[in-house]
Amino acid sequence: MTPDDIAALPYRKCVGVVLWDGAGRVFTGQRYDSELPAWQMPQGGIEDGEDARTAALRELVEETGVAVEKVEVLAETPDWIKYDLPPEIVPRIWKGRYKGQAQRWVLMKFLGSDADINIETKHPEFSEWRWLEPASVLDSIVPFKRDVYEQVFDAFSDWL
């Protein structure tokens, strides 16, 4: 794909979940499909008919096994936060249909215990998980998502 081809592509609408433990740490998972260190917070596409909150709760269950009764939704980013994929991976991800993602992020307080987290879901996203402070998350993610995560942590700084 040429740079002009990539520039003409749309962004994929997506949600992200900041699952906060109430003690300054957030859930972070190592991507199952990556051989390199690629830690991230739960995220996924918004399906037809879903709003960001509904999609975020669905993604939470799908990726972490955490039941919706074990969280309290606290906040949502007011605007879409966008990121571009590195050009060399655009053709490989989402069949080359998107240049990146436009995300709405939802902050949830985790009300359960670690035993309520089960990443061995029907379609696993993560091979392992841990609680990390936001600064450590920024050190653990792929570089092209760093700016997004900084904006998200800033948006939720009253809690984190």
Curated annotation (Swiss-Prot):
Residues 10-154 form the Nudix hydrolase domain. Disulfide bonds: none annotated. Keywords: Hydrolase. One of its GO terms (molecular function) is guanosine-3',5'-bis(diphosphate) 3'-diphosphatase activity. The keyword Zinc-finger does not apply. SUPFAM superfamilies: Nudix (SSF55811). Gene3D superfamilies: Nucleoside Triphosphate Pyrophosphohydrolase. InterPro entries: Nudix_hydrolase (IPR020476), NUDIX_hydrolase-like_dom_sf (IPR015797), NUDIX_hydrolase_CS (IPR020084), NUDIX_hydrolase_dom (IPR000086), RppH (IPR022927). Belongs to the Nudix hydrolase family. RppH subfamily. Accelerates the degradation of transcripts by removing pyrophosphate from the 5'-end of triphosphorylated RNA, leading to a more labile monophosphorylated state that can stimulate subsequent ribonuclease cleavage. This is RNA pyrophosphohydrolase. It comes from Dinoroseobacter shibae (strain DSM 16493 / NCIMB 14021 / DFL 12).
